[in-house]
Amino acid sequence: MARDIGLNIPAPSEECDDAYCPFHGTLPVRGQILVGTVVSSKMDNTVVIERQYMKMVSKYQRYEKRRSKIHAHNPACISAKVGDIVTIAECRPISKTKSYVVVKAEVPK
């Protein structure tokens, strides 16, 4: 039975026994909700998400493209793969580099 995490995101259909799953474990989510693309899933239960955004350069009154990479926990019930568009939510630090957890993954069209 999946618990309500307080976001307008449906619970995954699969079950898992991961303690760091926000739906089936005890990990609370709070803070930022971000969307990005998975660029790596080689680590165990971890994915790397890349976000692209525009930054204003005030001297030239133009925008420049920037990107950032964020490490996030990937529960077994969601299992995002490279190329998927994922929604991640901020949580307490899970490890030295992971403070986000994947809450939704969708395959791009």
Curated annotation (Swiss-Prot):
A GO BP annotation: translation
Any GO CC annotation of this UniProt entry: cytosolic small ribosomal subunit
One of the record's GO molecular function terms: structural constituent of ribosome
UniProt cross-references to Pfam families, sorted A to Z: Ribosomal_S17
PROSITE patterns reported for this sequence: RIBOSOMAL_S17 (PS00056)
Highest taxon of the lineage: Archaea
UniProt keyword terms in alphabetical order: Ribonucleoprotein, Ribosomal protein, RNA-binding, rRNA-binding
Job description of the protein: One of the primary rRNA binding proteins, it binds specifically to the 5'-end of 16S ribosomal RNA.
Subunit (UniProt): Part of the 30S ribosomal subunit.
Record family assignment: Belongs to the universal ribosomal protein uS17 family.
Classification via HAMAP family: Ribosomal_uS17_A (MF_01345_A)
Record-linked NCBIfam families: PRK08572.1 (NF006345), uS17_arch (TIGR03630)
PANTHER family the UniProt entry points to: 40S RIBOSOMAL PROTEIN S11 FAMILY MEMBER (PTHR10744), 40S RIBOSOMAL PROTEIN S11-RELATED (PTHR10744:SF9)
Protein name: Small ribosomal subunit protein uS17A
Organism this protein belongs to: Methanosarcina acetivorans (strain ATCC 35395 / DSM 2834 / JCM 12185 / C2A)
Name of the gene this protein is made from: rps17-1
